[in-house]
Regions:
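Histidine-centered catalytic micro-motifs
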Residues: 47, 91-111
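Short, small-residue-biased leader/transition segments that mark boundaries at the very start
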Residues: 1-8
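Conserved His + Asp/Glu catalytic blocks
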Residues: 9-13, 96, 108-138
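Short beta-strand/loop segment at the start of cytosolic alpha/beta domains
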Residues: 17-36
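Short histidine-centered catalytic/ligand-binding loop motif
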Residues: 43-65
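A short glycine-rich, hydrophobically flanked beta-strand micro-motif that places a catalytic Asp/Glu
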Residues: 80-92
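Long, well-ordered alpha-helical scaffolding segments within enzyme catalytic domains
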Residues: 60-78
Length: 138
Protein backbone atom coordinates (compact mmCIF):
# COMPACT_ATOMS: atom_id res chain seq x y z
CA UNK A 1 0.00 0.00 0.00
CA UNK A 2 1.24 3.47 -0.84
CA UNK A 3 1.75 6.05 1.85
CA UNK A 4 0.97 9.74 1.43
CA UNK A 5 4.63 10.43 0.62
CA UNK A 6 4.45 7.99 -2.29
CA UNK A 7 1.31 9.67 -3.60
CA UNK A 8 3.11 13.03 -3.70
CA UNK A 9 6.04 11.46 -5.56
CA UNK A 10 4.01 10.05 -8.49
CA UNK A 11 5.22 12.92 -10.63
CA UNK A 12 5.67 10.92 -13.81
CA UNK A 13 1.90 10.38 -13.95
CA UNK A 14 1.06 14.00 -14.80
CA UNK A 15 1.87 16.23 -17.75
CA UNK A 16 2.20 19.24 -15.43
CA UNK A 17 5.36 18.07 -13.68
CA UNK A 18 7.46 18.78 -16.78
CA UNK A 19 6.27 22.41 -17.01
CA UNK A 20 8.08 25.39 -15.52
CA UNK A 21 6.66 26.19 -12.09
CA UNK A 22 7.01 29.78 -10.93
CA UNK A 23 5.64 29.31 -7.42
CA UNK A 24 4.87 26.39 -5.14
CA UNK A 25 4.27 25.26 -1.61
CA UNK A 26 3.81 21.87 0.01
CA UNK A 27 0.36 21.38 -1.54
CA UNK A 28 0.16 23.33 -4.82
CA UNK A 29 2.24 24.80 -7.60
CA UNK A 30 1.56 27.53 -10.15
CA UNK A 31 2.48 27.69 -13.80
CA UNK A 32 1.40 29.68 -16.83
CA UNK A 33 -1.17 28.05 -19.09
CA UNK A 34 0.36 26.73 -22.31
CA UNK A 35 -2.67 27.99 -24.27
CA UNK A 36 -3.55 31.19 -22.38
CA UNK A 37 -6.98 32.76 -22.71
CA UNK A 38 -5.44 36.09 -21.65
CA UNK A 39 -1.88 37.14 -20.73
CA UNK A 40 -0.76 35.74 -17.34
CA UNK A 41 -3.43 32.97 -17.41
CA UNK A 42 -2.26 30.81 -14.51
CA UNK A 43 -2.90 27.22 -13.50
CA UNK A 44 -3.00 26.18 -9.85
CA UNK A 45 -2.14 22.47 -9.62
CA UNK A 46 -2.07 20.20 -6.57
CA UNK A 47 1.29 18.55 -5.88
CA UNK A 48 -0.63 15.33 -5.24
CA UNK A 49 -1.79 13.71 -8.46
CA UNK A 50 -5.59 13.73 -8.28
CA UNK A 51 -8.11 14.12 -11.06
CA UNK A 52 -11.10 15.83 -9.47
CA UNK A 53 -11.58 18.87 -7.24
CA UNK A 54 -13.73 16.61 -5.09
CA UNK A 55 -10.69 14.45 -4.28
CA UNK A 56 -8.93 17.28 -2.41
CA UNK A 57 -8.43 16.36 1.23
CA UNK A 58 -9.34 18.79 4.05
CA UNK A 59 -5.77 20.10 4.41
CA UNK A 60 -5.53 20.77 0.67
CA UNK A 61 -8.90 22.54 0.76
CA UNK A 62 -7.66 24.71 3.62
CA UNK A 63 -4.52 25.65 1.68
CA UNK A 64 -6.04 26.14 -1.77
CA UNK A 65 -7.58 29.57 -1.40
CA UNK A 66 -4.58 31.23 0.29
CA UNK A 67 -2.42 29.93 -2.59
CA UNK A 68 -4.96 31.15 -5.16
CA UNK A 69 -4.99 34.56 -3.47
CA UNK A 70 -1.18 34.64 -3.61
CA UNK A 71 -1.27 34.02 -7.37
CA UNK A 72 -3.91 36.74 -7.82
CA UNK A 73 -1.64 39.19 -5.99
CA UNK A 74 1.36 38.21 -8.13
CA UNK A 75 -0.66 38.86 -11.29
CA UNK A 76 -1.90 42.23 -10.02
CA UNK A 77 1.63 43.31 -9.12
CA UNK A 78 2.91 42.23 -12.54
CA UNK A 79 0.06 43.83 -14.51
CA UNK A 80 -1.94 46.63 -12.87
CA UNK A 81 -4.30 46.74 -15.89
CA UNK A 82 -5.96 43.55 -14.55
CA UNK A 83 -9.30 44.47 -12.95
CA UNK A 84 -11.07 41.11 -12.60
CA UNK A 85 -10.62 37.33 -12.78
CA UNK A 86 -12.41 34.23 -13.95
CA UNK A 87 -11.68 31.15 -11.84
CA UNK A 88 -12.58 27.82 -13.37
CA UNK A 89 -12.30 24.06 -13.10
CA UNK A 90 -13.29 21.62 -15.84
CA UNK A 91 -14.19 18.72 -13.54
CA UNK A 92 -15.00 15.72 -15.68
CA UNK A 93 -14.99 14.94 -19.40
CA UNK A 94 -18.49 16.36 -19.89
CA UNK A 95 -17.28 19.63 -18.36
CA UNK A 96 -14.41 19.80 -20.84
CA UNK A 97 -11.57 18.24 -18.84
CA UNK A 98 -8.79 17.18 -21.20
CA UNK A 99 -5.92 16.77 -18.70
CA UNK A 100 -6.38 14.15 -16.01
CA UNK A 101 -4.78 16.08 -13.17
CA UNK A 102 -6.81 18.65 -11.28
CA UNK A 103 -5.94 22.23 -12.19
CA UNK A 104 -7.67 25.50 -11.46
CA UNK A 105 -7.63 28.23 -14.10
CA UNK A 106 -7.00 31.77 -12.84
CA UNK A 107 -7.74 33.96 -15.84
CA UNK A 108 -6.92 37.68 -15.52
CA UNK A 109 -9.41 40.03 -17.13
CA UNK A 110 -8.92 43.58 -18.34
CA UNK A 111 -11.36 46.30 -19.38
CA UNK A 112 -12.40 45.78 -23.00
CA UNK A 113 -10.78 42.34 -23.42
CA UNK A 114 -14.14 41.25 -24.87
CA UNK A 115 -17.04 43.38 -26.03
CA UNK A 116 -19.52 42.25 -23.37
CA UNK A 117 -18.31 40.06 -20.50
CA UNK A 118 -21.82 39.60 -19.06
CA UNK A 119 -22.48 36.02 -18.07
CA UNK A 120 -18.81 35.12 -17.56
CA UNK A 121 -18.57 31.42 -16.74
CA UNK A 122 -22.11 30.88 -18.03
CA UNK A 123 -20.40 30.95 -21.44
CA UNK A 124 -19.56 27.26 -21.02
CA UNK A 125 -23.04 26.82 -22.51
CA UNK A 126 -22.97 29.60 -25.15
CA UNK A 127 -26.75 29.90 -25.41
CA UNK A 128 -26.93 30.58 -21.65
CA UNK A 129 -24.26 33.29 -21.45
CA UNK A 130 -26.35 36.29 -22.43
CA UNK A 131 -29.36 37.03 -20.26
CA UNK A 132 -31.34 39.95 -18.87
CA UNK A 133 -32.81 40.55 -15.41
CA UNK A 134 -36.18 39.76 -16.98
CA UNK A 135 -34.86 36.28 -17.91
CA UNK A 136 -33.89 35.66 -14.28
CA UNK A 137 -37.47 36.20 -13.07
CA UNK A 138 -38.78 33.26 -15.14
Amino acid sequence: SRGLGDVYKRQSESIFYSFKKFDENEFFFALRDGYPVTPLHTLIVPQRHIISYFELNPVEHQNLFPFLERQKNKILSEDPSVTAFNIGINDGPDAGRSVHHLHIHLIPRRPGDIENPQGGVRGVIPSKQKYTKKDLKK
